[in-house]
């Protein structure tokens, strides 16, 4: 779960579900208590910053997984939807994230903390940075970008 403070361009990563080998049904069971009864959104106090945020229970998923999205909806998570998908969108999302301050509590979200701290551009055999971003060890980074999809692709907002 992420929140975004537009005024300060700050992303708060508030909690995570990070488990390997889960079925879509098991994932839905983990997510449901976090969004139950929250279809219109509510406000809450961030445990990280102490700031009040508007929370929306939209669930953005990898657009390459339409069957998984359908499964989540079949399990009662009607707010599951595909994130924006077009050529270059992964690079654009990461660029958008790079231009914001990101606050991560390593105790509440250890996997997100690990990934964000360790993620970097690919290197060649001599250790020189390449322009490409590796598509590995970035599951929580992807999840954060999916969660903020509506903001990232909002008209008039740039990376």
Q: Where do the language-model regions lie?
A:
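Charge-patterned, long linear interaction tracts outside catalytic cores
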Residues: 134-159
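Gly/Thr-rich phosphate-binding beta-strand-loop-beta motif of the actin/hexokinase/Hsp70
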Residues: 1-5
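Mg2+-dependent endonuclease catalytic cores in nucleic-acid-processing enzymes, primarily RNase H-like
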Residues: 7-135, 152-155
């Amino acid at each position: 779960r992420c929140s975004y403070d537009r005024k300060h361009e700050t992303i708060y990563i508030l909690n995570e579900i990070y488990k390997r080998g889960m079925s879509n049904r098991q994932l839905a069971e983990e997510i449901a208590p976090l969004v139950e009864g929250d279809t219109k959104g509510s406000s809450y106090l961030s445990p990280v910053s102490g700031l009040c945020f508007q929370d929306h229970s939209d669930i953005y998923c990898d657009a390459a997984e339409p069957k998984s999205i359908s499964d989540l909806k079949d399990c009662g998570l009607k707010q599951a939807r595909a994130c924006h998908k077009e050529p270059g969108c992964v690079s654009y999302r990461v660029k958008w994230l790079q231009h914001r301050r990101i606050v991560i509590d390593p105790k509440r979200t250890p996997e997100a903390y690990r990934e964000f701290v360790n993620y970097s551009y690919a290197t060649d055999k001599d250790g020189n940075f390449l322009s490409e971003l590796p598509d590995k060890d970035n599951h929580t980074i992807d999840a954060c970008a999916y969660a903020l999809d509506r903001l990232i692709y909002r008209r008039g907002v740039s990376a």
